[in-house]
Amino acid sequence: MPNQFLSPEGDLENYFVDEYWLIDQYVGDQLWTWGQNAQGQLGTNDTTDRSTPVTTFAGGTDWKQVSGGGSHTTAIKTDGTLWIWGWNDFGLLGTNDTTQRNTPVTTFAGGTNWKQVAGGSSHTIAIQSVDFTGF
C-alpha cells in the first residue's frame, strides 16, 4: 500500500523518478531528494541512502530544471549554469574525468546558457542556447 509523506513547504513544480530514487523540485526552486544513494546521486555529500526527503548539498533556492538517469542527477539553475552529480563512469558527468561526485558540480563545458538537460543510464545530453540562422 502506498504511504503518504509530508512534503517540504511549497507546491510540487517538477520531479524526476528513477527505479530506486526520487528528486522533487518545489515552487521556490528547492531540490529535495531521497532513496538509493550508492553513487552519490542524491547530492548529499555522501553515499548514505535516505528514507526521508533531504535537500541537496548545494542547497539554494535557484534550481530551474532537474533530471537524471541511471545513477546520476542533472540540474540547471535559474542563472543558466548546468550542475551534475553522482556516478561518472564513461565520463557522463561532463567533468573531463570519471570521478564520482557526491555533491553538485558544474560541467567541464561551463557556460550560463544551458536550456535543457536529460540523463540516460550511461550518458547525459544537454541543450545550450546558441544563435543561428536557419535556411
What are these regions (language model features)?
Residues 32-51, 86-102:
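Short glycine/serine- and acidic-residue-enriched loop/turn motifs that recur at repeat junctions
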Residues 1-28, 129-135:
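Enriched but not universal
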Residues 118-132:
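Blade-level signature of beta-propeller repeat domains, shared across WD40, Kelch, NHL, RCC1
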Residues 33, 72-75, 84, 123-126:
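Conserved core positions of repeat-based scaffolds
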Residues 30, 36-39, 59-60, 79-81, ...:
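Acidic glycine-/aspartate-rich tracts in secreted/extracellular proteins
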Residues 48, 52-54, 58, 62-71, ...:
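Thr-biased low-complexity repeat/linker tracts and other Thr-enriched repetitive architectures
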